Amino acid sequence: MIIEKAKSYGFCFGVKRAVEIAEESQNAVTLGPLIHNPLEIERLAKNYNVKYVETIEDIDENVKRVIVRTHGIPKDKLQNLKEKNVEIIDATCPFVKKPQEIVEEMSKQGYDIVIFGDKNHPEIQGVMSYSVHNRVYVVLDPKELEGIRLKEHIATVAQTTRKINDYLKITNYLIQNYKEVRVFNTICNATFENQDAVRELAKKADIMIIIGGKNSSNTKQLYNIAKEFCEAYLVESEEELKKEWFEGKKHCGISAGASTPEWLVEKIISRIKELA
């Protein structure tokens, strides 16, 4: 069986930067998981004593340094963190900071804000918090906008890990129904590249293995694209692989989410070779 990796996959710039920051910040804690990959979080805790807490209240008084996760945190939480006697190390991805800045600036100019994304995702919770008013609407589908009467001046941004075609559905609806719509394409280039690469590979493979955290938005997007073209599975570790998946298969494609380290990809490929 041929095992082929997608042309573009795995650690993106923002995640690589955050992991390097964590490795250089031994004994620090992160506010929320640094990235959406439990095995990499486990490695950082084991090798560098960089652990995470869920809330500011959970930060022990002995902690000297706190790392802000790649997804960013809400503005009020950042302010609360500044009031504590700790050094703040900001590992927010620069591509995530961009929609934060846009939302802050456009809301100051009086624009209603439409955000394409998952309102429960930490990145979006952070982006929302930068609006200076409460006319902020987070949607995943244009139908969610039908019952809302927006002002005539609208600015829109997208979660960095979403599919561009889904964002276009939102922007097309807004342009058809409102006079002024400022569209900011805040979807990350790495997301585009990984999605294009998985689509290309899935078209010629008869099975795709997508590696990454089950709670990772960008990994789920890769899995959803892959399964449009062939049998596909999303796994976090080699223990989840099953021998029967590979029976009769001739071409196995591999891709991985932006928070998936290369050591994990190689570990899973080794296990596939044993099973196939």
Curated annotation (Swiss-Prot):
Keywords: 4Fe-4S, Iron, Iron-sulfur, Isoprene biosynthesis, Metal-binding, Oxidoreductase. Pathway: Isoprenoid biosynthesis; dimethylallyl diphosphate biosynthesis; dimethylallyl diphosphate from (2E)-4-hydroxy-3-methylbutenyl diphosphate: step 1/1; Isoprenoid biosynthesis; isopentenyl diphosphate biosynthesis via DXP pathway; isopentenyl diphosphate from 1-deoxy-D-xylulose 5-phosphate: step 6/6. [4Fe-4S] cluster binds at C12, C93, C188. Dimethylallyl diphosphate binds at H36, H71, H121, S216, S217, N218, S259. (2E)-4-hydroxy-3-methylbut-2-enyl diphosphate binds at H36, H71, H121, T160, S216, S217, N218, S259. GO terms for molecular function: 4 iron, 4 sulfur cluster binding; 4-hydroxy-3-methylbut-2-enyl diphosphate reductase activity; metal ion binding. It comes from the Bacteria. Binds 1 [4Fe-4S] cluster per subunit. Belongs to the IspH family. Catalyzes the conversion of 1-hydroxy-2-methyl-2-(E)-butenyl 4-diphosphate (HMBPP) into a mixture of isopentenyl diphosphate (IPP) and dimethylallyl diphosphate (DMAPP). Acts in the terminal step of the DOXP/MEP pathway for isoprenoid precursor biosynthesis. This is 4-hydroxy-3-methylbut-2-enyl diphosphate reductase. The lineage of its organism: Bacteria, Pseudomonadati, Campylobacterota, Epsilonproteobacteria, Nautiliales.
